[in-house]
């Protein structure tokens, strides 16, 4: 990918009562690329003006600066300026940024799961689901904070869940700059019916696609979440933007149904038994995740002290979607595995550890099974979900007040682009490389300490790891038979 042929189109409107002759001109700033056309418009006419590389060879661009997702390269952007002039005077102008990249997908995988490619290279999707703020109380400050956390976590794709909205221009601008891919759904979900006014829906769809299609971060169109498309939606989307892939709903065409959604014993992720629906660490999973208890400060924002401790199940369940995530039962039992708590302060601290360990385990299990390196082919995971739309006891990487939980930092660790990890089922150490570059003569080291900080095991190994590769089961950690029940593992790469 060292050359590109760009096509530029712009709608020009003549709102006057007479015919107008005008010049439509464009410039890719900083690249010495200019092009223009003289046209005539009838009164009230709207026309799409297209500049093709065949007609304007200067739109054949050499020495490309490609746009890449997070960890894959730099998300380079270009700027396009367009003007329309009448009798030598600029009547209107616009400015937009765009990126040069190619995003495709297919089902040429062992299990026919959907595989994405960026600029011709396979990309393992380590993504997440985005739920809009519960009352749509958006601000640029909140949007920036949430996307900054999203990038910090290391995920590379954000799914705009079908029960949500199409986010702001500023949201997509930040995704462009941060290298975050976006999977856009269009306001239909399995627990709602089709719109009463389909013409209005399609008009809104057209407006949204036109608004978002210049953003290089926009990667994929999906009509709905677990539902069917509105008749005519696919044809309209493809007419407006044939450069991106499309599927009817979130669980078809190589994307299977999701789960799990609740906390489980972390070992179940390694065993691939975390979902009651069967194997879900395989193929492309659009919804796989678990909640995390928010910080104590946030819990005190959610409910009165008398309901916090001892846990008032009725109140906790109300702030858990009717008890959907089992925070007052299953999550409580997992916290109690670290000892019965005597106060909400103690419970909240242990609750952070439970959520963090589950999040880290989920990501590391998917790292292990990345593409064709693991026990089964995995092309992508979308975590369910990572932001927090309302005050609730089932927080995610951060809570509604934008206070991070331990899950953010454990996810950040698991998704670092060059990462050493431990399999608690096999006692094996592996290394995952998410860069499109190789690393030679790196040392992976494992140290084990008992509860008294005494080192009881140490081993290191030199490795060469190729681009986007996983080296699984490099060596086993042999734990001494007399090790303290609580012990610590430290992994390092250097």
What are these regions (language model features)?
Residues 1-161, 166, 368, 372-378, ...:
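Secreted/periplasmic carbohydrate-active enzymes, especially glycoside hydrolases
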Residues 83-85, 170, 174-180, 211, ...:
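Alpha-helical structural signal in soluble globular domains
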Residues 89-220, 317-356, 431:
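Active-site-adjacent substrate/metal-binding segments within catalytic domains
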Residues 92, 206-314:
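Active-site region of glycoside hydrolase catalytic domains
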Residues 106, 132-134, 165-168, 190-192, ...:
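Flexible loop/turn segments at secondary-structure boundaries
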Residues 156-157, 179-181, 219-220, 243-245, ...:
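Beta-sheet entry/capping signal
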Residues 272-447, 455-458:
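Substrate-binding clefts and catalytic carboxylate motifs of secreted carbohydrate-active enzymes
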């Amino acid at each position: 990918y060292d050359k590109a042929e760009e096509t530029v189109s712009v709608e020009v409107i003549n709102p006057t009562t007479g015919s107008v002759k005008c010049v439509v001109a464009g410039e890719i700033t900083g690249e010495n690329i200019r092009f223009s056309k003289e046209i005539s418009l009838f009164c009230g006419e709207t026309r799409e003006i297209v500049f093709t590389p065949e007609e304007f060879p200067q739109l054949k661009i050499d020495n490309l600066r490609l746009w890449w997702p997070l960890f894959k390269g730099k998300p380079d952007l270009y700027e396009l300026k367009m003007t329309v002039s009448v009798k030598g005077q600029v009547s209107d102008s616009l400015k937009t940024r765009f990126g040069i990249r190619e995003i495709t997908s297919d089902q040429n995988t062992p299990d026919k799961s959907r595989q994405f490619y960026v600029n011709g290279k396979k990309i393992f999707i380590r993504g997440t689901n985005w739920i809009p703020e519960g009352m749509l109380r958006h601000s640029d400050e909140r949007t920036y904070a949430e996307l900054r956390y999203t990038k910090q976590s290391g995920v590379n794709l954000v799914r705009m869940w079908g029960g949500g909205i199409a986010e702001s221009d500023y949201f997509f601008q930040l995704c462009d700059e941060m290298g975050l891919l976006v999977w856009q759904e269009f306001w239909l979900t399995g627990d709602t019916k089709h719109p009463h006014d389909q013409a209005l829906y399609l008009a809104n769809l057209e407006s949204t696609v036109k608004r978002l299609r210049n953003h290089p971060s926009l990667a994929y169109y999906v009509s709905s979440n677990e539902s069917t498309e509105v008749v005519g939606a696919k044809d309209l989307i493809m007419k407006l933007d044939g450069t991106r892939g499309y599927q009817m709903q979130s669980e078809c065409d190589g994307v299977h149904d999701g789960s799990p959604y609740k906390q489980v014993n972390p070992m179940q992720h390694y065993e691939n038994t975390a979902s009651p629906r069967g194997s879900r660490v395989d193929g492309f999973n659009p919804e796989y995740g678990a909640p995390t208890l928010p910080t104590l400060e946030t819990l005190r924002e959610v409910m009165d002290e008398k309901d916090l401790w001892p846990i008032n199940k009725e109140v906790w369940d109300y702030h858990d979607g009717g008890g959907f995530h089992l925070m007052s039962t299953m999550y409580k039992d997992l916290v109690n595995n670290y000892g019965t708590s005597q106060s909400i302060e103690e419970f909240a601290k242990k609750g952070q550890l439970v959520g963090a360990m589950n999040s880290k385990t989920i990501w590391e299990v998917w790292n292990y099974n990345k593409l064709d390196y693991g026990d089964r082919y995995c092309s992508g995971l979308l975590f369910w979900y990572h932001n927090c739309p309302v005050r609730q006891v089932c927080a995610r990487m951060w809570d509604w007040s934008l206070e991070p939980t331990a899950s953010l930092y454990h996810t950040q660790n698991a998704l670092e682009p060059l990462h050493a990890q431990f399999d608690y089922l096999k006692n094996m150490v592996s290394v995952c490389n998410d860069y499109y570059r190789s690393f030679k003569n790196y040392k992976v080291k494992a140290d084990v300490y008992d509860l008294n900080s005494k080192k009881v095991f140490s081993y290191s190994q030199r490795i060469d790891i190729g681009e986007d590769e996983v080296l699984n089961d490099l060596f086993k950690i042999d734990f001494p038979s007399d090790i303290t029940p609580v012990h610590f593992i430290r992994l390092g790469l250097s």
